[in-house]
Amino acid sequence: MSTISYTAVGRRKEATAKVKLQPGTGIITVNKKPGETYFNYNSEYLSTLRGPLLALGLENDYDLHITAKGGGIKGQTDAVKLGLARAICTMSSEKRESLKPHGYLTRDYRAKERKKYGLRKARKAPQFSKR
């Protein structure tokens, strides 16, 4: 007998997170570590990734099994948030209407701008010398 699970992928900058949502007691596991340990007990990160569940009042009804790769912790947190919102939408399409106004289903497309030739960074030019 297999348990019901919902899976989705979220991305932000260079970070990618696969989120698996299963009925449970609210345990968060990131890369086989407890969520609090992985995010260094930072309450801001933990509340950000729990956002979609808190908006629907489901924070203690589902366990999260997350695989996060790339980027930094902040990017991974936002990737998890998007993946979680998408997983909730696959669970029930009625929940989409309550997640959409909060912005949980919107992917933040901003990424690092590429370096251009003749410049030191993406936009930083070498110092101009008149003579």
From Swiss-Prot:
Pfam families xrefs: Ribosomal_S9 (PF00380)
Gene3D superfamilies, per the entry: 3.30.230.10
Assigned GO CC terms: chloroplast; cytosolic small ribosomal subunit
Keyword hit for Transport: no
Membership in a protein family: Belongs to the universal ribosomal protein uS9 family.
GO MF annotations in UniProt: RNA binding; structural constituent of ribosome
Protein name: Small ribosomal subunit protein uS9c
Classification of source organism: Eukaryota, Haptista, Haptophyta, Prymnesiophyceae, Isochrysidales
Record's keyword terms, sorted: Chloroplast, Plastid, Ribonucleoprotein, Ribosomal protein
Record flagged with keyword Ribosomal protein: yes
Species of the source: Emiliania huxleyi (Coccolithophore)
GO terms under biological process: translation
